[in-house]
Design a protein with these regions (language model features):
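Catalytic P-loop NTPase motifs of RecA-like helicase/translocase cores
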Residues: 5, 31-32
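Active-site mouth loops of central-metabolism enzymes
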Residues: 1-7, 49
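Extended hydrophobic packing segments that form well-structured cores
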Residues: 155-166
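Shared catalytic-loop signature of beta/alpha-barrel
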Residues: 15, 21, 32-146, 150-153
């Protein structure tokens, strides 16, 4: 929901979509308000996820301490790179919480999820993938819904300098 709802409307929408048995309801409350998310989480039959739009470790800590989400969503392109995302994954692990990628950039984030014990789903967000396809060579393509980590050095893809020059 991209942090777009107040608590009342988030609850109403969650109740309406619960029969669809979705995996989780992503960032329903404005500004990822940990207190309001925790209250919402206690009242819902579906899991909540959050953090894809967060960039600071203490914001993830607050989501965990308040038990505001079931699934934490660090993103290496938004939240301070791989070092910060690994720290957040470690915090989540200490709270027995899985992580999932939200906010796209799967070719970057799949490496985080493949490298931590609580890594999980990686969102194949089409607009972000299209941007990556225009800027990089050697990107991994999904096969039957799965991305395979490359065995080449680094992230497994290279910057297309000609595309950047254009």
């Amino acid at each position: 929901a991209n942090c777009s709802l107040d608590a009342y409307h988030a609850f109403q929408l969650a109740q309406a979509i619960a029969p669809a048995r979705i995996g989780f309801f992503e960032e329903p409350i404005a500004e990822n308000d940990a207190r309001l998310l925790a209250d919402l989480r206690r009242r819902l039959p579906i899991q909540l996820a959050g953090g894809q739009n967060e960039g600071l470790a203490h914001r993830f800590r607050d989501l965990l301490v308040h038990q505001a989400v079931d699934v934490l969503q660090p993103n290496v392109t938004i939240g301070g790179g791989f070092t910060q995302a690994v720290r957040v994954a470690g915090m989540a692990s200490a709270f027995n919480s899985p992580i999932a990628n939200g906010g796209g950039w799967p070719c970057h984030n799949m490496h985080l999820h493949g490298g931590v014990e609580n890594g999980g789903l990686v969102e194949y967000h089409h607009p972000a993938v299209v941007v990556c396809q225009q800027l990089f060579n050697g990107l991994t393509e999904p096969v039957d819904g799965w991305l395979t980590l490359p065995e080449t050095p680094g992230l497994g893809f290279d910057l297309d300098r000609d595309a950047v020059a254009e």
